[in-house]
C-alpha cells in the first residue's frame, strides 16, 4: 500500500471531462459515465486516460489509472517548448508556439490541462477543427510528442549544432 501512496504523490491529476451517456434498452435508458483525465509530474512526463463506469467516481479512478499506464516523456528544457509544433487527431488541430518567460499558458481549458501537467510554464496555443475535449487533448499530446531538443534535431540530421542554427 505504501508504494501506491508514493506514486499518487508523484503525479498530479486533472479531470478534463465527465460525460453521462445512455444505452436505450427495453425497459428505458441505462445511464453510465465516462471520464477523461490528465496525469503529469510537471517535469516532462504526462499521460491521458479514458475511463468508463456506472458511477462517476469509478469512471474517474479508471481514467486516472489508465493515464498513469500511458505516460509519455516530453522533450523540453526550461520554461517553454523548443520550437513551434502542430498536433493532429481526427479533425482536431492544435498549434503550440514557444513564448518568452512570464507569458504564461495562453490556451483553452483542454490544452491548458495537459500543458500544465507536462510542466511547461510559457506557451501560446491555438486549437481549431473539432472542439471535442477528447480530440483536443489527444491532438495536444500528439504535438508534445513531436517536440525535440536542438541536440536531438542535429543528431537526427547528422549535422552539428552550429550548422543547425546557421552559424557555420
Curated annotation (Swiss-Prot):
Superkingdom of source: Bacteria
Domain S5 DRBM: 11-74
Transmembrane segments: none
UniProtKB keywords: Ribonucleoprotein, Ribosomal protein, RNA-binding, rRNA-binding
Any GO molecular function: rRNA binding
Gene Ontology cellular component annotations, sorted alphabetically: small ribosomal subunit
InterPro entries in alphabetical order: Ribosomal_Su5_D2-typ_SF, Ribosomal_uS5, Ribosomal_uS5_bac-type, Ribosomal_uS5_C, Ribosomal_uS5_N, Ribosomal_uS5_N_CS, Ribsml_uS5_D2-typ_fold_subgr
Pfam families hit by this protein: Ribosomal_S5, Ribosomal_S5_C
Record GO biological process: translation
Function in brief: With S4 and S12 plays an important role in translational accuracy. Located at the back of the 30S subunit body where it stabilizes the conformation of the head with respect to the body.
Domain remark text: The N-terminal domain interacts with the head of the 30S subunit; the C-terminal domain interacts with the body and contacts protein S4. The interaction surface between S4 and S5 is involved in control of translational fidelity.
Family in the record: Belongs to the universal ribosomal protein uS5 family.
Subunit-structure text: Part of the 30S ribosomal subunit. Contacts proteins S4 and S8.
UniProt protein name: Small ribosomal subunit protein uS5
UniProt organism field: Leptospira borgpetersenii serovar Hardjo-bovis (strain JB197)
Upper classification of the organism: Bacteria, Pseudomonadati, Spirochaetota, Spirochaetia, Leptospirales
Amino acid at each position: 500500500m505504501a508504494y501506491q501512496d508514493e506514486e499518487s504523490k508523484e503525479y498530479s491529476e486533472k479531470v478534463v471531462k465527465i460525460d453521462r451517456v445512455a444505452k436505450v434498452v427495453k425497459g428505458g435508458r441505462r445511464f453510465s459515465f465516462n471520464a477523461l483525465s490528465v496525469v503529469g509530474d510537471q517535469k516532462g512526463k504526462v499521460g491521458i486516460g479514458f475511463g468508463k463506469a456506472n458511477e462517476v467516481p469509478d469512471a474517474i479512478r479508471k481514467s486516472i489509472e489508465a493515464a498513469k499506464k500511458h505516460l509519455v516523456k516530453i522533450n523540453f528544457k526550461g520554461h517553454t517548448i523548443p520550437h513551434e509544433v502542430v498536433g493532429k487527431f481526427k479533425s482536431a488541430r492544435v498549434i503550440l508556439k514557444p513564448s518568452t518567460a512570464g507569458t504564461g499558458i495562453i490556451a483553452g481549458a483542454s490544452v491548458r490541462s495537459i500543458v500544465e501537467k507536462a510542466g511547461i510554464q510559457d506557451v501560446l496555443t491555438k486549437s481549431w477543427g473539432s472542439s471535442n475535449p477528447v480530440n483536443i487533448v489527444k491532438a495536444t499530446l500528439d504535438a508534445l510528442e513531436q517536440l525535440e531538443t536542438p541536440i536531438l534535431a542535429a543528431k537526427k540530421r547528422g549535422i552539428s549544432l552550429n550548422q543547425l542554427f546557421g552559424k557555420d
